[in-house]
UniProtKB/Swiss-Prot annotation:
Belongs to the universal ribosomal protein uL11 family. The keyword Ribonucleoprotein applies. It comes from Aeropyrum pernix (strain ATCC 700893 / DSM 11879 / JCM 9820 / NBRC 100138 / K1). Gene3D superfamilies: Ribosomal protein L11, C-terminal domain. This is Large ribosomal subunit protein uL11. The gene is rpl11.
Length: 108
């Protein structure tokens, strides 16, 4: 490790912290550990930009939604798979547009 560098938290760690959970769900399809607003998912995507292969904010958000689903976190009270479908349908375009500048400014 380079002196002075910090280890960045993983996506899972950021999601767990956001829902105040200690561990992922052992059965994420049936047992949920918390719920986050869509905007928190967007903020995590921006924070993780340097570590993601996603070229767009929308793609990064979909990556974070996949991680949320795999650990038992819902988004706006819905399964992240449903939210991903809504992202593709343009339901969240206005929210994403609001964060586009922050995405562009983020390192990555």
């Amino acid at each position: 490790m380079v002196k002075g560098s910090q280890v960045k938290p993983s996506t899972t760690e950021l999601l767990l912290k956001a829902v105040s959970a200690k561990a992922p769900s052992g059965d994420p399809i049936h047992q949920k550990i918390g719920d986050l607003p869509f905007e928190k998912i967007v903020e995590i995507a921006i924070e993780k930009k340097p570590d993601l292969l996603a070229k767009t904010l929308k793609a990064a958000v979909k990556t974070i939604l996949g991680s949320a689903r795999s650990i038992g976190v819902t988004v706006d009270g819905k399964d992240p798979k449903e939210v991903t479908r809504q992202v593709d349908e343009g339901v969240y375009d206005a929210v994403l547009a609001k964060y586009e500048e922050k995405w562009e400014e983020a390192e990555g």
